[in-house]
Design a protein with these regions (language model features):
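Cofactor-binding active-site loop characterized by glycine-rich and histidine/acidic residues
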Residues: 1-101
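Short secondary-structure boundary/capping segments
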Residues: 2-6, 93-97, 122-127, 160, ...
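Catalytic cores of large soluble enzymes that bind and process phosphate-bearing ligands
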Residues: 12-19, 45-55, 86, 118-126, ...
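Hydrophobic, small-residue-rich alpha-helical packing segments that form membrane-like cores
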Residues: 56-80, 89-114, 123-136, 154-167
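Short catalytic-loop micro-motif centered on adjacent basic/acidic residues
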Residues: 79-81, 140-145
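Acidic, glycine-rich active-site loops and adjacent beta-strand->loop/helix elements
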Residues: 81-88, 111-116, 147-150, 176-178
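Structured core elements
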Residues: 107-109, 143, 171-173
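Glycine/aspartate-rich loop-and-adjacent alpha/beta segment that forms the canonical ThDP
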Residues: 132-135, 150, 154-204
Length: 204
Protein backbone atom coordinates (compact mmCIF):
# COMPACT_ATOMS: atom_id res chain seq x y z
CA UNK A 1 0.00 0.00 0.00
CA UNK A 2 2.82 2.42 0.87
CA UNK A 3 4.30 1.95 -2.62
CA UNK A 4 1.11 1.90 -4.70
CA UNK A 5 -1.54 3.71 -2.68
CA UNK A 6 -3.97 0.99 -3.80
CA UNK A 7 -6.50 0.34 -1.01
CA UNK A 8 -6.76 -3.33 -1.92
CA UNK A 9 -3.46 -3.80 -0.06
CA UNK A 10 -4.78 -2.27 3.17
CA UNK A 11 -5.68 -4.74 5.90
CA UNK A 12 -9.03 -3.59 7.34
CA UNK A 13 -7.96 -5.02 10.71
CA UNK A 14 -4.98 -2.65 10.93
CA UNK A 15 -1.24 -3.03 11.45
CA UNK A 16 -1.69 -5.48 14.30
CA UNK A 17 -2.80 -8.06 11.72
CA UNK A 18 -0.67 -6.94 8.78
CA UNK A 19 2.36 -9.04 7.87
CA UNK A 20 5.46 -7.11 6.79
CA UNK A 21 8.85 -8.30 5.54
CA UNK A 22 10.36 -7.16 8.84
CA UNK A 23 8.13 -9.61 10.69
CA UNK A 24 10.15 -12.47 9.19
CA UNK A 25 13.04 -11.40 11.43
CA UNK A 26 10.91 -12.41 14.43
CA UNK A 27 10.52 -16.01 13.23
CA UNK A 28 10.78 -18.45 16.15
CA UNK A 29 11.48 -15.65 18.60
CA UNK A 30 9.44 -14.92 21.71
CA UNK A 31 6.38 -12.92 20.68
CA UNK A 32 7.28 -13.33 16.99
CA UNK A 33 6.07 -15.56 14.20
CA UNK A 34 5.85 -19.24 15.18
CA UNK A 35 7.83 -21.87 13.28
CA UNK A 36 4.54 -23.52 12.38
CA UNK A 37 1.97 -20.94 11.34
CA UNK A 38 -1.09 -20.56 13.54
CA UNK A 39 -4.46 -18.85 13.16
CA UNK A 40 -3.69 -15.88 15.34
CA UNK A 41 -2.16 -12.44 15.22
CA UNK A 42 -0.49 -11.61 11.94
CA UNK A 43 -1.16 -15.06 10.50
CA UNK A 44 -4.89 -15.04 11.21
CA UNK A 45 -5.45 -15.41 7.45
CA UNK A 46 -4.59 -19.13 7.69
CA UNK A 47 -7.66 -21.36 7.63
CA UNK A 48 -6.11 -23.95 9.96
CA UNK A 49 -3.21 -24.24 12.37
CA UNK A 50 -0.18 -26.10 11.05
CA UNK A 51 2.30 -28.28 12.88
CA UNK A 52 1.91 -31.99 13.62
CA UNK A 53 2.48 -34.31 10.67
CA UNK A 54 -0.78 -35.32 9.04
CA UNK A 55 -2.68 -32.59 10.88
CA UNK A 56 -4.07 -31.09 7.68
CA UNK A 57 -5.59 -34.30 6.30
CA UNK A 58 -9.01 -34.00 7.92
CA UNK A 59 -9.43 -30.25 7.31
CA UNK A 60 -8.47 -30.72 3.64
CA UNK A 61 -11.06 -33.47 3.19
CA UNK A 62 -13.62 -31.39 5.07
CA UNK A 63 -12.95 -28.33 2.93
CA UNK A 64 -13.22 -30.40 -0.27
CA UNK A 65 -16.49 -31.92 0.96
CA UNK A 66 -17.96 -28.51 1.83
CA UNK A 67 -17.00 -27.06 -1.55
CA UNK A 68 -18.20 -30.06 -3.54
CA UNK A 69 -21.68 -29.88 -2.05
CA UNK A 70 -21.98 -26.11 -2.29
CA UNK A 71 -22.13 -23.65 -5.16
CA UNK A 72 -18.32 -23.90 -5.47
CA UNK A 73 -18.24 -27.54 -6.57
CA UNK A 74 -15.60 -26.86 -9.26
CA UNK A 75 -13.12 -25.47 -6.73
CA UNK A 76 -10.15 -27.74 -6.05
CA UNK A 77 -8.51 -28.21 -2.66
CA UNK A 78 -4.75 -28.84 -2.60
CA UNK A 79 -3.20 -30.48 0.46
CA UNK A 80 0.60 -30.56 0.72
CA UNK A 81 2.23 -33.27 2.82
CA UNK A 82 5.44 -35.23 3.20
CA UNK A 83 5.45 -38.99 3.48
CA UNK A 84 5.83 -38.74 7.26
CA UNK A 85 2.40 -37.15 7.51
CA UNK A 86 0.86 -40.13 5.75
CA UNK A 87 1.65 -42.43 8.68
CA UNK A 88 -0.87 -40.92 11.09
CA UNK A 89 -4.27 -42.42 11.82
CA UNK A 90 -6.11 -39.28 10.79
CA UNK A 91 -4.39 -39.43 7.40
CA UNK A 92 -5.65 -42.98 6.78
CA UNK A 93 -9.16 -42.00 7.82
CA UNK A 94 -9.11 -38.93 5.57
CA UNK A 95 -8.00 -40.99 2.55
CA UNK A 96 -10.78 -43.51 3.15
CA UNK A 97 -13.37 -40.75 3.65
CA UNK A 98 -12.23 -38.85 0.55
CA UNK A 99 -12.83 -41.90 -1.64
CA UNK A 100 -16.12 -42.77 0.03
CA UNK A 101 -17.43 -39.23 -0.32
CA UNK A 102 -16.29 -38.97 -3.95
CA UNK A 103 -14.02 -35.98 -3.38
CA UNK A 104 -12.64 -35.65 -6.89
CA UNK A 105 -11.84 -32.02 -6.06
CA UNK A 106 -9.23 -33.05 -3.45
CA UNK A 107 -5.62 -33.20 -4.65
CA UNK A 108 -2.78 -34.24 -2.37
CA UNK A 109 0.68 -33.01 -3.34
CA UNK A 110 3.19 -35.35 -1.69
CA UNK A 111 6.76 -34.13 -1.20
CA UNK A 112 8.55 -37.48 -1.25
CA UNK A 113 12.00 -36.67 0.16
CA UNK A 114 12.52 -39.54 2.65
CA UNK A 115 13.29 -37.31 5.65
CA UNK A 116 11.64 -35.53 8.54
CA UNK A 117 13.50 -34.14 11.55
CA UNK A 118 15.16 -37.41 12.61
CA UNK A 119 18.36 -39.06 11.39
CA UNK A 120 16.48 -42.19 10.34
CA UNK A 121 14.96 -41.96 6.83
CA UNK A 122 11.26 -42.63 6.38
CA UNK A 123 12.01 -45.49 3.99
CA UNK A 124 13.29 -47.42 7.03
CA UNK A 125 9.91 -46.97 8.70
CA UNK A 126 7.30 -46.69 5.95
CA UNK A 127 7.52 -49.26 3.15
CA UNK A 128 6.47 -48.68 -0.42
CA UNK A 129 5.88 -45.67 -2.62
CA UNK A 130 3.11 -43.10 -3.09
CA UNK A 131 1.26 -45.53 -5.37
CA UNK A 132 1.19 -48.01 -2.49
CA UNK A 133 0.03 -45.32 -0.09
CA UNK A 134 -2.89 -44.03 -2.18
CA UNK A 135 -4.05 -46.52 -4.83
CA UNK A 136 -5.36 -49.09 -2.30
CA UNK A 137 -7.63 -46.32 -1.03
CA UNK A 138 -9.08 -45.83 -4.50
CA UNK A 139 -7.17 -42.67 -5.38
CA UNK A 140 -5.78 -41.72 -8.80
CA UNK A 141 -1.98 -41.38 -8.48
CA UNK A 142 0.64 -39.75 -10.73
CA UNK A 143 4.06 -38.30 -10.08
CA UNK A 144 7.60 -37.58 -11.17
CA UNK A 145 11.09 -38.61 -10.09
CA UNK A 146 12.19 -35.06 -10.94
CA UNK A 147 10.17 -33.06 -8.45
CA UNK A 148 12.12 -29.84 -9.03
CA UNK A 149 11.32 -29.65 -12.75
CA UNK A 150 8.13 -27.74 -13.57
CA UNK A 151 7.59 -29.44 -16.92
CA UNK A 152 7.72 -32.88 -15.28
CA UNK A 153 5.39 -31.71 -12.52
CA UNK A 154 2.82 -30.33 -14.98
CA UNK A 155 2.94 -33.51 -17.08
CA UNK A 156 2.26 -35.60 -13.98
CA UNK A 157 -0.49 -33.21 -12.89
CA UNK A 158 -2.24 -33.56 -16.25
CA UNK A 159 -2.14 -37.36 -15.84
CA UNK A 160 -4.32 -37.07 -12.75
CA UNK A 161 -7.22 -35.84 -14.85
CA UNK A 162 -7.10 -38.67 -17.37
CA UNK A 163 -9.30 -40.65 -15.00
CA UNK A 164 -12.85 -41.21 -16.22
CA UNK A 165 -14.03 -41.18 -12.62
CA UNK A 166 -14.61 -37.49 -11.84
CA UNK A 167 -15.28 -38.32 -8.18
CA UNK A 168 -11.88 -39.96 -7.64
CA UNK A 169 -9.54 -38.11 -5.24
CA UNK A 170 -6.05 -37.53 -6.60
CA UNK A 171 -2.45 -37.66 -5.36
CA UNK A 172 0.49 -35.99 -7.10
CA UNK A 173 3.88 -37.16 -5.78
CA UNK A 174 7.14 -35.31 -6.33
CA UNK A 175 10.50 -36.95 -5.62
CA UNK A 176 12.71 -34.24 -4.13
CA UNK A 177 15.82 -33.69 -2.01
CA UNK A 178 15.09 -31.92 1.25
CA UNK A 179 17.25 -28.81 1.54
CA UNK A 180 17.88 -28.39 -2.19
CA UNK A 181 19.22 -24.90 -2.87
CA UNK A 182 19.82 -24.37 0.84
CA UNK A 183 23.03 -26.40 1.24
CA UNK A 184 21.79 -28.21 4.36
CA UNK A 185 20.30 -31.49 3.32
CA UNK A 186 17.83 -34.08 4.57
CA UNK A 187 16.92 -33.90 8.27
CA UNK A 188 19.78 -31.45 8.97
CA UNK A 189 17.88 -28.73 7.08
CA UNK A 190 15.00 -28.66 9.56
CA UNK A 191 14.98 -25.58 11.78
CA UNK A 192 18.62 -24.86 10.97
CA UNK A 193 19.03 -21.40 9.47
CA UNK A 194 22.38 -20.20 8.19
CA UNK A 195 24.10 -17.75 10.51
CA UNK A 196 22.90 -14.22 9.83
CA UNK A 197 25.17 -12.27 7.47
CA UNK A 198 27.21 -15.38 6.66
CA UNK A 199 28.15 -16.11 3.05
CA UNK A 200 25.48 -18.85 2.91
CA UNK A 201 22.87 -16.47 4.34
CA UNK A 202 23.36 -13.98 1.50
CA UNK A 203 23.87 -16.56 -1.25
CA UNK A 204 20.37 -17.92 -0.69
Amino acid sequence: YNETGDVKYVNPMGDKFTLYWEDLLTLRRRGGLPGHAEMEGKTLFFKYNTGPSGHGAAPAAGQAFALKYSVASNTRVFAMEGEGGLTTGVSHEARIAAYGLGLGNLIYVVDWNDYGIDDRPFSDIKAGSPKDWFEPYGWKVAGTENGEDWESILTAYDELFESENKNQPKALWLKTRKGRGYDKFDNASHGAPHKRNSKEFWNI
